[in-house]
């Protein structure tokens, strides 16, 4: 498996910091002997610039790894602690280069960092959880990749559930549209039926009126016939 670029850069940055500490110590020893040190000073200044570039690169790599979930938040915090230590060492080295710091403290800090790289207990590992305690970088990275895969699987399952719910919602919406269409058709049918009933009722009323008129006419005709019969009926 290819090495993690962050840790590769971190290792090279630590080497630069260690080299700067050694060069500063060498320069100070030369100055105590009254020797000129322009070449050493130029070398140290160049190494300090390289150290700053490396630290900025580590910051960018860490930010990208955390934002894209390539590593867990726990691992991100652990790397941030390592990065903070490098930033502190950079300030100490710069102060010592400018003769503003204590050389013994600077060299001791740098050597302690190198011993930590070789296996001396690291103060940030004292509170390390059981899941990662005693594991190497590759093993921790594999564990993180497994966690990320599990998280991705969970997100895929959640996405599938949401998709099914969305599909069910669309189906329910389509069914409601169909029910609304049926209700609209029934409403139109009821309205048409009601109109037909009103029309038939008007026809029945008209027929009733005509029937009543015909009855009156028949009565009148019968009365006329009766009058005529009585008039022509012989009295003897």
From Swiss-Prot:
Tissues/organs with expression: Widely expressed in all tissues examined.
Segments on the Cytoplasmic side according to the record's topology features: 1-215
Coiled-coil residues: 42-65
One biological process term in Gene Ontology: vesicle fusion
Name of this protein: Syntaxin-8
Assigned protein family: Belongs to the syntaxin family.
Cited Pfam families: SNARE
Domain (t-SNARE coiled-coil homology): residue spans on this chain: 145-207
PANTHER family the record matches: SYNTAXIN, SYNTAXIN-8
Native organism: Rattus norvegicus
Protein location: Membrane
InterPro entries: Syntaxin (IPR045242), Syntaxin-8_SNARE (IPR041875), T_SNARE_dom (IPR000727)
Record SUPFAM superfamilies: SNARE fusion complex
């Amino acid at each position: 498996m290819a090495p993690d670029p962050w840790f590769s850069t971190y290792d090279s940055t630590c080497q630069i910091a260690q080299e700067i500490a050694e060069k500063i110590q060498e320069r100070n020893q030369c100055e105590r002997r009254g020797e000129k040190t322009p070449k050493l000073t130029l070398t140290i200044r160049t190494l300090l610039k390289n150290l700053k570039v490396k630290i900025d690169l580590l910051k960018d790599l860490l930010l990208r790894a955390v934002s894209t979930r390539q590593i867990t938040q726990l691992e991100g915090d652990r790397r941030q602690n390592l990065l903070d230590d490098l930033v502190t060492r950079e300030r100490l080295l710069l102060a010592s280069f400018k003769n503003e710091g204590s050389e013994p403290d600077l060299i001791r800090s740098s050597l302690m960092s190198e011993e930590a790289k070789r296996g001396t207990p690291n103060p940030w590992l004292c509170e390390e959880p059981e899941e990662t305690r005693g594991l190497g970088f590759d093993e921790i990275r594999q564990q993180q990749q497994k966690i990320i895969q599990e998280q991705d699987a969970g997100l895929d399952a959640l996405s599938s559930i949401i998709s099914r719910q969305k599909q069910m919602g669309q189906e329910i919406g389509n069914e409601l549209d169909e029910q609304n269409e049926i209700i609209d058709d029934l409403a139109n049918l009821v309205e048409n039926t009601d109109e037909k009933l009103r029309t038939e009722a008007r026809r029945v009323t008209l027929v009733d009126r005509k029937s009543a008129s015909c009855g009156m006419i028949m009565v009148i005709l019968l009365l006329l016939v009766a009058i005529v019969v009585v008039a022509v009926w012989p009295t003897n």
